[in-house]
Amino acid sequence: RKNTVNVEDELEARKKSGKGFFGDNVLALCSKADIVFMGLHGSNGEDGKIQAAFELMGIKYTGTDYISSAISMSKELTKKVLVPDGIPMPKGVALKRGHKIEYVPYPCVVKPCCGGSSVGVSIVANDAEFKEALTEAFSYEDNILVEEYIKGREFSVGVLDGKALPVIEIE
């Protein structure tokens, strides 16, 4: 018999119940390990919260530190870090729930500020699609980005010990 748990639902239930972010004895168990392998994906594994808890407790772990994780999970913060250093980024605006945008250049991309794996992302070509995209993006969080659409191919480059790994095309 195989039991599966929706982690997002479990974390939300823990938050509402006041039980805390981690399951019973998780931090105590992790503190006994030589190193914790971070194999987590999504907002609760990549946003820096778990990494910060580990650092506060002196638990060694693999992967990115908590500040870098938090910045990387926020597309808005990432832009604020990269643009001043001359890294080209799509032009766009951050939009909070309830605020209006004066002008929308089509085509554009509408997406939640945080998250990954293209969750909540829409490519929009007109006003009707824009309205639907806003509803979709705001269903994930209260802060979204509206950016220019840049047609092209998508690539990913991992970095290990300061050295670029091979380029991988995302299809």
Features from the language model and the residues they span:
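ATP-binding N-terminal substructure of ATP-dependent carboxylate-amine bond-forming enzymes
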Residues: 1-67, 71-73, 77, 84, ...
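Structural detector of well-ordered beta-strand residues that form the stable sheet scaffold
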Residues: 62, 90, 109, 145-147, ...
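Glycine-rich phosphate-binding loop of ATP-grasp-fold ATP-dependent ligases
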Residues: 90-91, 107-136, 154
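Phosphate-binding site of ATP-dependent enzymes
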Residues: 125-171
